[in-house]
């Protein structure tokens, strides 16, 4: 009879070669992590009897596949590096598939006027900051539903909120810093609806780990009856990301309104939607190369491709650069400086790797010499061979010398004159293998700057290995 850790080690030996091998000195530690993760969030039974009964269809493999499918990973049933990376991310303690409820079916509050009480306060933040974070988190949900929330200072409330650590006598102990950040129980009597936050975490009111407002808003979704979402852009996605602007996605809004009905507001609120890489109508805000990869930006998200992995990675911009705003308008790489510059409005940021350089953001007029009539940059690209950077603004473009750090004389010029066939407006552009790739709406033009000719016309998302467009 195989023990669960041994079975996991055997699975590792059969692992995919698409990802880096797990170092042997950390393998045992990761095996234990995988076991605990699947037990905690995917209802894996660790008893040897179940494994023996399902010897030819291992429950470990099935649970790994279930987890990989939930997170949109390549479904292999093997604990590859990408799977381990997702498992190591901080997250909500509510399981993704197992029951974590006190009532059968789809629990909901019968009363839409709910009360909450903060039983104790974390010392990480001033009490006023905790009160504000909790109030704002509830307001997110009340804005899109008929629910109201009133704070009480004593007695039993519908939703009791506490900061605790370790084993706090609810059969769901916390695990220390990182990992399981908080959990909440779905509507019901006694502990139903209550939210617990791990006091071993450091709670903040900014982008540093962990933003209390962001985590509380997620947990209160559980308190109201919502389960986890597979939509990475949803607030109810299980893993923790801080995107700067905590908001409900359309997926979250649809979920809460399915339980309680629409908001009482005359105009129903609409939330952002997560881009789908194989959507034939997909457009981009900005695109740039970065150290051999290509990154496409849309709203709060980036989509990344590299030569070694065919699937596009979709994630939040804030994962790499929490200081950058959402809705970037232009970006380009300065390869000889190992920098990427991002633009929004009249400001730009320079980054090296995952670090935003000191002194940024800066003003585009002072740094590049744009006239005051230029309010923002639509697109930008830098030629690696010449050090010339092209800035596209409305139907004109400027050319900037990265070595001299000055605008070239004789600009701006008309886009249509020097880049015939691409139209007079550019949404995004990048250079690869000597060619420019211009994007406007759902179209992409491969352009040869030497011959000034369009070579191909394709869908904007043709880089994403989609079967149909």
From Swiss-Prot:
PROSITE patterns per the UniProt record, alphabetical: CYSTEINE_SWITCH, HEMOPEXIN, HEMOPEXIN_2, ZINC_PROTEASE
Which residues bind Zn(2+) 2 per the record?
92, 218, 222, 228
List the propeptide region positions: 19-99
The protein's location, in the record's own words, is:
Secreted, Extracellular space, Extracellular matrix
Q: What reactions does this protein catalyze?
A: Cleavage of the triple helix of collagen at about three-quarters of the length of the molecule from the N-terminus, at 775-Gly-|-Ile-776 in the alpha1(I) chain. Cleaves synthetic substrates and alpha-macroglobulins at bonds where P1' is a hydrophobic residue
Query: What does the entry list as the binding residues for Ca(2+) 4?
Result: 285, 329, 378, 427
Report what the protein is called: Interstitial collagenase
Species for this entry: Equus caballus
Lineage of the organism? Eukaryota, Metazoa, Chordata, Craniata, Vertebrata
What is the gene called?
Answer: MMP1
